[in-house]
């Protein structure tokens, strides 16, 4: 069978930043996408097979203007360009489920990206990404799994348009290429479920923000060589009569590799802005068929604010409470405090 989609979005955006040159941004975005996929299910004596073939096409056009920010008053125009981001991807995925409890999933995707602000200032970025996933059911409650895949992340139009030399398009910014490895275990009962996952991610040309003195408060972007991330994630759900409890914990170490900037060797330094630990707890009460209460707490651990790891930002908590009630059959009223 075939499954297709189409969407269109329009955004009109105005922002004021705390600096003069280019400090007022006007953006009108037109974004649409379409795609289709063909799925075929085949049943054999000892396995079930699913084959998926698909194609996607996305087109984003940003009419971006910048003006001088004269203490909140729009001044002279400093940038006026129509930016384009066009993506086309084709993919194939094959999945087989065996009666022994083994599941195998593998696929490949080829993607072409055309990015720029006119026909003479376009760059082409393409990538072939394979993936492989294996899982095995040990019994009715336990499942182990492994996955490998590569990923390809292009710079966004916002990242490309913020160029320190003022030309409005940073052709030196490259795509981020990553390899991801994951191994884990799941256990599920009627009222409780656990999942534990260990992962390793290596990347080249990772894109990170930075600031320069002339434009304090404005982010520019650059590639940082390579990075190495590893971590452990634990997720659990407890179901009870009146609702459920969700728990999620992440422990990670995210480091630069082979990265020298302004004469400083940042190899083995921690990537700034990423906490080493995070804990999320959600308590969801179903007060009645139409009323729900959600209590959630998020603990963000310590992280560094700079590449040299000289400034440490302390941990903090975010607590949210939300109450919602269905007022009509297809509408809901909610109120919350953060």
Q: Where do the model's predicted regions map?
A:
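Residue-level signature of outer-membrane beta-barrel architecture
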Residues: 40-42, 86, 92-100, 126, ...
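C-terminal beta-signal and adjacent terminal beta-strands/loops
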Residues: 204, 299-306, 325-338
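Gram-negative outer-membrane beta-barrel transporters
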Residues: 38, 198-202, 220-306
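Hydrophobic, lipid-facing positions within transmembrane beta-strands of outer-membrane proteins
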Residues: 30-36, 86-92, 128-132, 144, ...
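Surface-exposed extracellular loop regions of Gram-negative outer-membrane beta-barrel proteins
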Residues: 59-70, 112-116, 122, 136, ...
């Amino acid at each position: 069978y075939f499954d297709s989609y189409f969407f269109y979005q329009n955004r009109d955006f105005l922002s004021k930043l705390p600096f003069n040159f280019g400090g007022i941004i006007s953006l009108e975005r037109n974004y649409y996408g379409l795609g289709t996929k063909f799925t075929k299910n085949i049943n054999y004596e000892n396995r079930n097979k699913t084959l998926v073939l698909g194609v996607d096409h996305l087109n984003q056009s940003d009419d971006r203007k910048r003006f001088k920010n004269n203490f909140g008053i729009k001044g002279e125009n400093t940038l006026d360009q129509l930016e384009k981001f066009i993506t086309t991807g084709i993919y194939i995925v094959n999945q087989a489920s065996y009666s022994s409890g083994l599941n195998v999933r593998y696929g490949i995707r080829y993607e072409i990206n055309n990015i720029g602000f006119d026909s003479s200032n376009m760059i082409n970025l393409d990538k072939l990404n394979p993936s492989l996933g294996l899982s095995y059911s040990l019994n009715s409650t336990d499942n182990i799994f492994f996955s490998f895949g590569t990923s390809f992340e292009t710079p966004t139009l916002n990242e490309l348009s913020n160029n320190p030399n003022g030309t409005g398009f940073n052709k030196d910014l490259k795509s981020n290429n990553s390899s991801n490895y994951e191994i884990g275990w799941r256990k599920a009962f009627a009222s409780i479920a656990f999942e534990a996952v260990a992962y390793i991610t290596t990347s080249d040309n990772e894109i990170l923000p930075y600031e320069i003195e002339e434009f304090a408060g404005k982010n520019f972007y650059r590639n940082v060589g390579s990075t190495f991330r590893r971590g452990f994630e634990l997720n659990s759900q407890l179901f009870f009569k009146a609702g459920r409890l969700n728990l999620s914990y992440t422990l990670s170490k995210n480091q630069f590799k082979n990265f020298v900037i302004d004469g400083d060797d940042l190899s083995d330094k921690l990537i700034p802005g990423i906490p080493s630990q995070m804990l999320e707890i959600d308590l969801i009460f179903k007060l009645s068929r139409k009323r729900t209460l959600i209590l959630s707490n998020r603990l963000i651990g310590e992280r560094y604010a700079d590449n040299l790891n000289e400034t440490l930002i302390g941990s903090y908590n975010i607590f949210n409470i939300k109450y919602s009630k269905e007022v009509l059959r297809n509408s809901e009223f909610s109120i919350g405090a953060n």
